[in-house]
Amino acid sequence: MIMRFGYVSHAMALWDCSPAKTITFTSFQKLSKQEREDKLYDVTKQNLEHTLRILHYNIAHEIPLYRLSSSIVPLATHPEVEFDYIGAFTPLWRKIGALIKEHNLRISFHPNQFTLFTSDKPHITTNAITDMTYHYKVLDAIGIADSSYINIHVGGAYGNKEKAIERFHENIKKLPAHIKKQMTLENDDKTYTTAETLSICQKEKIPFVFDYHHHMANLCEEPLEELLPAIFETWSHTNIVPKVHISSPKSKKEFRAHAEYIDLEFIKPFLHVAKKINHNFDIMIESKQKDLAMLQFIQELSSIRGIKRISSSTLQW
């Protein structure tokens, strides 16, 4: 069983390398037309250059997974902001894409919790489609839209989970098919359990990104031993291995909050279930210390008998 690792957005080991520098709309409004264009251009350019730095760092550390920042283009989906963020940076997008393809990196996006398809308000669905389209356009500009995924949560329950799930199935039809083909769903820590998310994924033929921390915060009746094989099966129509999210609680009191690093004892039960299935899968680390937490966790895991480190960020068990 091969386990490959990655982390989210910011490389903590790199100085001043945020790929998510931004400008608020309030500040944006105060600028002249030329100043607005210059500011959007400068901030986006810096984010793309920082993304390139991070990718080089990942390659040097043999880190095969990476989640791009959704804030790579500031104010990209704001209705009052017009900015050709694709055409203005074609060489940089292509440079990023060439690096990703040359080193076979697995890239993803994770829009925020407001991108959902369970609302009864049409404008919420419209905004979700706009946001998904933005993420897809970035992946397309990079040249990896057919091999990368945009991960979201199911959404809210709005007092009636059954009705909300029905709305999800209806609203998702409005998302263009080529974008839906590149989306994944994740179980959340309060509303939609692993079993509920799995059912939706199976019906819509959407790959399921399983989050173990969320699962433990929002347990369902079905045991993980039954759920995990079915979760992995949702990836069978793709040409890539399943991906899971790993983090551990900040404390018992703040169970849903992410800790700085990974608590191996918290994760062990999941790993033992995964080992019984013996299916290759990828792990996205969602701890606060990102790449540092990931490398420390890999080091801890590699000291366990039977687990072999075959590269800086890949283990065999």
UniProtKB/Swiss-Prot annotation:
Main EC class the enzyme belongs to: hydrolase
EC number: 3.-.-.-
Keywords, comma-separated and alphabetical: DNA damage, DNA excision, DNA repair, Endonuclease, Hydrolase, Nuclease
Domain of life: Bacteria
MF annotations from Gene Ontology: endonuclease activity
Signal peptide as annotated in the record: none
GO biological process terms on file: nucleotide-excision repair; pyrimidine dimer repair; response to UV
Cited HAMAP family: UV_endonuclease
Family, per entry: Belongs to the uve1/UvsE family.
Described purpose of this protein according to its UniProt entry: Component in a DNA repair pathway. Removal of UV LIGHT damaged nucleotides. Recognizes pyrimidine dimers and cleave a phosphodiester bond immediately 5' to the lesion.
Name the record gives this protein: UV DNA damage endonuclease
Name of the encoding gene: uvsE
